[in-house]
Amino acid sequence: MTIQRSVVAVPARLASSRLPDKVLAEIGGKPMIQRVLEQCAKAKGPAAVVLCTDSQRLQQLAKAWGFPVLMTSESCSSGSERIASVADELVARAWGETADQWDQPTHIQRLAATAVINVQGDQPFLEPEVVTAMVDEFNHRDSVPAVVTPVYRLKPDNIHNPAVVKTLLAHDGRALYFSRSAIPHVRDVEPAQWHQHTDYWGHVGMYGFRGDVLAAWDLLPASPLEDLERLEQLRLIEAGHTIATFPVEGTSLSVDTAEQLEQARRMAEA
């Protein structure tokens, strides 16, 4: 089985605990969520870019900008849970169909042959080429992975920043763990010098899901690690799924704090 279709899903809400209404914050004269949707639309490959939200306000704005919207429950606890709740509809859009057209064999085939690219709504400087690369990564391996995500080499000043998610990699590029702490810990060395002893990798907040894996999200057991770190991808790790990674240059700034919002505005003006 190979990936034959792809679709970008952008989960977004207004009730952000750390920075309320952040996706509507203006950056370079545009709301952040509009910048994200427009950057995703520049990627080659995906059949559509779909906003997934519980907000009627965001729904109205996205439609005015020309983007389709799928409404979700207010109770979704993460972006992945939000897009998983409409997985069938997302996959159907990738094929130009509706899910109610499918019989059971077609349903199974469509899910397994579709990549759903989850792009968080707080990445205003997302590079479209990264989205394109994520789709390509599914078919450039010996077997189609369950999940693909990009990583980047961290600069020393971000290694100990809890707002920057770190990724611990195996030799073959599999993600062993994700953390807000610096991993690995370098014993008997001052933390400021850890970068001199090993490479540290940051995680770009994007996930490429095989459709059947995404559709089964609500079947995954509760994850204590996810709750502790507040990192949704740990639910997959703890359940035994393999997350494949690939390196990208630089990083796409995720806006989670007021300081990062100001940084984004400065970048837009530069």
Regions found by a protein language model. Name each.
Residues L126-L220:
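Conserved core of the sugar-phosphate nucleotidyltransferase
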Residues W194-A270:
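Conserved alpha/beta core of the MobA/IspD/sugar-nucleotide pyrophosphorylase nucleotidyltransferase superfamily
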Residues V50, Q56-D136:
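Short phosphate-binding loop-to-helix
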Residues S17, I117, P124, T167, ...:
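Residues that recognize and position ribonucleotide moieties
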Residues P46, L111-A113, D142-P145, H241:
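Short, high-confidence coil segments that cap the C-terminus of an alpha-helix
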Residues V8, V49-L51, V116, V147-V148, ...:
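Hydrophobic/aromatic residues located in beta-strands of well-ordered beta-sheets
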Residues I3-T53:
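N-terminal glycine-rich phosphate-binding loop and ensuing alpha1 helix
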